[in-house]
């Protein structure tokens, strides 16, 4: 892509992680295009179409002076010399037809003189041989996978008119691989519905069988369907093997070159026919590297192998092996040899290379005795070549040597050519032989073979006339030839030339071949004639060289395909045609010399990068400030001009992103907005410091672009990082009627996705009406592990209204010698509305080592060791205004060293009598047992004081 537009037409983009993104060069047409392929087997434009008209007449006068009659034989041959007359299919006709017409007509008339006792005879045989080669394609999924840079019109496919370059396929692995040494892939080319049919045919009424009359308008047709495996590659081969009695071609021998074409004239495989083994070996071109799912059908003109199938009315096994698939069929052959004719001739074959006519004439098959025998050949449009010494005269010693196929085994004949004087005249267009050779009479039989070469100076289509002038009559036979399609331009052994040269990498892009620049391997090169018809194709070798051989003088076109990853260099730079680049398509002229100046240069297509930065715009000004940092993990997508995604990445830890290996062209960069962030203002300052928005259109033209940025900021609605993993282990049994109406109207629109692991065992009945509309989506993992061991000094105004109706009927039979008249029958209806404000100013010298291990589960396990040696004058005004200031320091090892103001000895280890005291209730719950415990404790303390006081009093007494 050489888009010259600037980079200014882009809108919005985000930097991404600095990942290198490799992008494959986009070949035109990712979607596969179905293309029909037709293979045309064998003919390759070098088959002759022969129509042989033989006309023999015998007119003998009643006396010796009567002018001899003239026998005429007309033999027409439609000869396409070195041109292929393939008719390519049109868009509305998916069948491709190649006409290869060979029509042979033989008419021979032998009329004896009325002086003879026998009645006149008229023997007439007319034969028309028309051969047609047709190929048709089954339009299955044939997918173009070429790396060609331009589409081609396809006229043979009704619904598909262009061949698009491939995307994906085989060439993507090695786009410039030179052809490797191929292997035989007979097992990968599959043939079905094979048939050898007689076109027209003649029904033998006596036998009821259809016969192949080789000289009477019949032709053999080899037909088959085929498929080619996709694994087949350029250079691979497969074979057609013909049997002993069967060969390709018609009257004209098959060309050594047997190319296979598709409907558009593109060469699928190059075939070489070996007449020795009667085998054609096909080598696949790079076409099979460009297309997949190739399948089709074909018809191929074939003929009886006359040197082996020699006898009329005989069934011969016609056998063929196409790849690994074999087929055979017995066919009755008839050549129509007339053994009673003194003179009969036939075109044995037409040479496919020089179009020479190889003729065979049978002289005196009836073995008549003559005193005069002059054999004359007159050529029109042809010439003899006396130096070739190919005018042969063989004496027949065995009647069986006159084989019906007109192809005798000359090794078994007696060559007597040197015994005769062959006189050439009329510019080598007439040859005369006196077969009597000095004898007075003779009944000898001869087989005469000649070769007539086309004469380009003649405007006539040409003919060959034979006469046998005897003492009895004059016999004549004429063979004329015409072209069905009116073309006949070959000229014997015309010299052939070469065309080609070099494809190289132009590293400095100057359009000229420099000494340090190397060739490019594996570039496809196609040769076409002046009419645009493909003649050949090849692939450059490891040195970038290519060559087409065997070309005649003329004008040719050479097309180079652009290898993947390359761009054509400047064409026709400088004045030296031998070292410049001729472009993708060039014309080469051959005129009596090789043309090795057709070169093409390419340079590696440069690749570019784009990207930059995504940042956190903390001040929301749309500009990148030095203190603002990048945002990690933002997804960035790259699309091509068609909107196809060609890459995705994410910004790195610095907010950077990057796409690499891009061609010049138009792209779109799309930033995915991070959750919880808002797009900042766009295009607020210079291009490399602003934000470009969520989608940015950008054009790369021969340079990188690292100005594609985007910024985001976070809304300030309640930065409530409410992930308080508050492990508040507050074992605070605080019965705090704490109506903590914490109307914390934290309207933090902060989308609080608070992962609050609040393991707060805090029994705090906090009625916290936290109407926090906190939308704070702050994924703030504030693992505040606040191990709030809450020494909750809960000043719990525990109004312990203990209304302890301690009807203690304490019958304390205390052996207290207390003269206290205290009958202590203390029906102590202690309706002790003890507000337990226990400001117990108890001056009781009660050393109350109250190891009150108040584990704040307020189990009141008051191990009150009241050893109170208290001299307690104890006016124990136990006005226990126990306001229960309840320093509920829940694990409070409250050693409650209740200083009773009495310097007493620490003795009275009063044991806790509530060994099974129950735990304090949950905060806010009601439990009278706790109040009762306090009441009883107070009563016991008072009772103890009374007893102690009584004992002291007694001692004092």
UniProtKB/Swiss-Prot annotation:
It comes from the Bacteria. It is a peptidoglycan-anchor. Homodimerizes; via N2-Domain. Interacts with host NRXN1; this interaction mediates bacterial attachment to host cells. The keyword Secreted applies. A motif (LPXTG sorting signal) lies at residues 920-924. Residues 924-957 form a propeptide. Residues 51-495 are annotated as: Ligand binding A region. Keywords: Calcium, Cell wall, Peptidoglycan-anchor, Repeat, Secreted, Signal. It comes from Staphylococcus aureus (strain MSSA476). The gene is sdrC. Residues 1-50 form the signal peptide. Gene3D superfamilies: 2.60.40.1280, 2.60.40.1290, Immunoglobulins. GO terms for cellular component: extracellular region. Cell surface-associated calcium-binding protein which plays an important role in adhesion and pathogenesis. Mediates interactions with components of the extracellular matrix such as host NRXN1 to promote bacterial adhesion. This is Serine-aspartate repeat-containing protein C. Residues 496-606, 607-717 form the CNA-B domain. Residues 51-166, 678-937 are annotated as: Disordered. Residues 56-71, 84-114, 133-164 have a biased composition (Polar residues). The keyword Cell wall biogenesis/degradation does not apply. Belongs to the serine-aspartate repeat-containing protein (SDr) family. GO terms for biological process: cell adhesion. Residues 685-695, 712-896 have a biased composition (Acidic residues). Its main location: secreted. Residues 115-132, 922-937 have a biased composition (Low complexity). The modification Pentaglycyl murein peptidoglycan amidated threonine is found at residue 923. Residues 72-83 have a biased composition (Basic and acidic residues). It is found in: Secreted, Cell wall.
């Amino acid at each position: 892509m050489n888009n010259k537009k600037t980079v200014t037409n882009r809108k919005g983009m985000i930097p991404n992680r600095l990942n290198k993104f490799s992008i494959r060069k986009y070949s035109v047409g990712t979607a596969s295009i179905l293309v029909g392929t037709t293979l045309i087997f064998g003919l390759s434009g070098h088959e002759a179409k022969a129509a042989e008209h033989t006309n023999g007449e015998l007119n003998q006068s009643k006396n010796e002076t009567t002018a001899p009659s003239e026998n005429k034989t007309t033999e027409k041959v439609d000869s396409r010399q070195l041109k292929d007359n393939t008719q390519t299919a049109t868009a509305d006709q998916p069948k491709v037809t190649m006409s290869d017409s060979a029509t042979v007509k033989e008419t021979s008339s032998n009329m004896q003189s009325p002086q003879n006792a026998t009645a006149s005879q008229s023997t007439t045989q007319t034969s028309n041989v028309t051969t047609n080669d047709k190929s048709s394609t089954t339009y299955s999924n044939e997918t173009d996978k070429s790396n060609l840079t331009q589409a081609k019109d396809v006229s043979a496919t009704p619904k598909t008119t262009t061949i698009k370059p491939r995307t994906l396929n085989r060439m993507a692995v090695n786009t410039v691989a030179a052809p490797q040494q191929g292997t035989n892939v007979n097992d990968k080319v599959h043939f079905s519905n094979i048939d050898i049919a007689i076109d027209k045919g003649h029904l033998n009424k006596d036998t009821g069988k259809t016969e192949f009359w080789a000289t009477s308008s019949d032709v053999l047709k080899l037909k088959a369907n085929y498929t080619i495996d996709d694994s087949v590659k350029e250079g691979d081969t497969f074979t057609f093997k013909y049997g002993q009695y069967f060969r390709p071609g018609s009257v004209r021998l098959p060309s050594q070159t047997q190319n296979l074409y598709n409907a558009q004239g593109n060469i699928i495989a190059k075939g070489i026919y070996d007449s020795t083994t009667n085998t054609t070996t096909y080598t696949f071109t790079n076409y099979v590297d460009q297309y997949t799912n190739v399948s089709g059908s074909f018809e191929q003109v074939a003929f009886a192998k006359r040197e082996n199938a020699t006898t009329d009315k005989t069934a011969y096994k016609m056998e063929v092996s196409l790849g690994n698939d074999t087929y055979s069929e017995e066919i009755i052959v008839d050549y129509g040899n007339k053994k009673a004719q003194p003179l009969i001739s036939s075109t044995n074959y037409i040479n496919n290379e020089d179009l020479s006519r190889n003729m065979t004439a049978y002289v005196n098959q009836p073995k008549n005795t003559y005193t005069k025998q002059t054999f004359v050949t007159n050529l029109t449009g042809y010439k003899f070549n006396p130096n070739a010494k190919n005018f042969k005269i063989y004496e027949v010693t065995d009647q069986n040597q006159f084989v019906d196929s007109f192809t005798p085994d000359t090794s078994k004949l007696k060559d007597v050519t040197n015994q005769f004087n062959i006189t050439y005249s009329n510019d080598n267009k007439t040859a005369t032989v006196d077969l009597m050779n000095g004898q007075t009479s003779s009944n000898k039989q001869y087989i005469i073979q000649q070769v007539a070469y086309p004469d380009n100076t003649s405007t006539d289509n040409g003919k060959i006339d034979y006469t046998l002038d005897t003492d009895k009559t004059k016999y004549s036979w004429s063979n004329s030839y015409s072209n069905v399609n009116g073309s006949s331009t070959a000229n014997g052994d015309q010299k052939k030339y070469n065309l080609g040269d070099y494809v190289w990498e132009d590293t400095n892009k100057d359009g000229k071949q420099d000494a340090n620049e190397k060739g490019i391997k594996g570039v496809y090169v196609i040769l076409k004639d002046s009419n645009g018809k493909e003649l050949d194709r090849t692939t450059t070798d490891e040195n970038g060289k290519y060559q087409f051989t065997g070309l005649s003088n003329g004008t040719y076109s050479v097309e180079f395909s652009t290898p993947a990853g390359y761009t054509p260099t400047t064409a026709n730079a400088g004045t030296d045609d031998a070292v410049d680049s001729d472009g993708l398509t060039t014309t080469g002229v051959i005129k009596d010399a090789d043309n090795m100046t057709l070169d093409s240069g390419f340079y590696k297509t440069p690749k570019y990068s784009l990207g930059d930065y995504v940042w956190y715009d903390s001040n929301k000004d749309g500009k990148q400030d030095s203190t603002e940092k990048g945002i990690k993990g933002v997804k960035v997508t790259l699309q091509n001009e068609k909107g196809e995604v060609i890459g995705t990445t994410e910004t790195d830890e610095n907010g950077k992103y990057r796409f690499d290996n891009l061609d010049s062209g138009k792209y779109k960069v799309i930033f995915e907005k991070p959750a919880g962030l808002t797009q900042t203002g766009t295009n607020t300052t210079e291009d490399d410091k602003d934000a470009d928005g969520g989608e940015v259109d950008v054009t790369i033209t021969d340079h990188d672009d690292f100005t594609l940025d985007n910024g985001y900021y976070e809304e300030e609605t309640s930065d409530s990082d409410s992930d308080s993993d508050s492990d508040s282990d507050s074992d605070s049994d605080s019965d705090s009627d704490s109506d903590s109406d914490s109307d914390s109207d934290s309207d933090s629109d902060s989308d609080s996705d608070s992962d609050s692991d609040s393991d707060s065992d805090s029994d705090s009945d906090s009625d916290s009406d936290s109407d926090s509309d906190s939308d704070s989506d702050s994924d703030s993992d504030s693992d505040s592990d606040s191990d709030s061991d809450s020494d909750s000094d809960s000043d719990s105004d525990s109004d312990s209204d203990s209304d302890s109706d301690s009807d203690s009927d304490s019958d304390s039979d205390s052996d207290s010698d207390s003269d206290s008249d205290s009958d202590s029958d203390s029906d102590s209806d202690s309706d002790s509305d003890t507000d337990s404000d226990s400001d117990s100013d108890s001056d009781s010298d009660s050393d109350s080592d109250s190891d009150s291990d108040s584990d704040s589960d307020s189990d009141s396990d008051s191990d009150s060791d009241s050893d109170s040696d208290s001299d307690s004058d104890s006016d124990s005004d136990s006005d226990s205004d126990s306001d229960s200031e309840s320093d509920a320091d829940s694990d409070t090892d409250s050693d409650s060293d209740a200083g009773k103001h009495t310097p007493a000895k620490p003795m009275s280890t009063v044991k806790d009598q509530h060994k099974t005291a129950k735990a304090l209730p949950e905060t806010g719950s009601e439990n009278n047992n706790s109040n009762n415990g306090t009441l009883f404790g107070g009563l016991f303390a008072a009772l103890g004081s009374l007893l102690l006081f009584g004992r002291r009093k007694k001692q004092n007494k």
